[in-house]
Amino acid sequence: MVTGNFNLEKLLKNLKKKTGKKAEILTMNEKVEKEDVVQNEANEQETVTKKNEEGDIVDKKDETPEVEEKIDKPETSTRKLEIHIAFLSEKYEADIGKVISKFEGVKTCKVDVENKKVVITGDFDEEKLWKELEEKMRKRIVKMEKEKKDDEPITKDEENEIDRGVYMNPSSDDEKEMARWMMFSDENPNACSIS
């Protein structure tokens, strides 16, 4: 719990930087000072009613609601970024969520495995986020690219050079029995070999 006068944004930024984890504001108690009450009462007295051309009574606030809303709301540069990731699956969901949620300025991160996309909202630098994702997920991205290359059609020249992965099992009983006795210790640590 933190009390006193301080800059909330700087405090959150320092907490995120020092701990490397996501920090959030759970509750915020604001003290109402006497000056604020006096200002609110003065604003209420300023709302004067007057008649418009049709004869209806209109408050002064109702005349320009758009201007007052813009003044009351501070501008934030919250953006929404949607990333499509081809290799997204359940086993990478947690890893990607961790990388993105630890990034500075990210407010929410939703990982949709079915549609293979990630939706990120917050105030962050897109280029830095891309670099961070590439850096952390490089091995997995390269792995998926290799798998995609294998799916491409093979020309006739390449067919002769490729090992088709066909291996014949020992056909005679002697070879099978010899293979049973000469088992490597890496495959079965409890086995013994008799030579």
UniProtKB/Swiss-Prot annotation:
One GO biological process this protein is involved in is: embryo development ending in seed dormancy
Lipidation sites, kind S-farnesyl cysteine, are: 192
What residues does the annotated propeptide cover? 193-195
* Modification sites for Cysteine methyl ester: 192
Keywords annotated in UniProt: Lipoprotein, Metal-binding, Methylation, Prenylation
Region (Disordered) residue spans: 36-76, 145-172
Residue ranges occupied by any HMA domain in the UniProt entry: 78-149
CDD domains (UniProt xref): HMA
One Pfam family this sequence matches: HMA
The answer on whether this UniProt entry bears the keyword Metal-binding reads yes
Question: Its Gene Ontology molecular function terms?
Answer: metal ion binding
Q: Which domain of life is it from?
A: Eukaryota
Record's compositionally biased regions (Basic and acidic residues): 47-76, 145-157
Function noted in UniProt: Probable heavy-metal-binding protein. Required for female gametophyte development and function.
Member of which family? Belongs to the HIPP family.
What is the name attached to this protein's record? Heavy metal-associated isoprenylated plant protein 18
Organism listed in the record: Arabidopsis thaliana (Mouse-ear cress)
- What lineage does the source organism belong to? Eukaryota, Viridiplantae, Streptophyta, Embryophyta, Tracheophyta
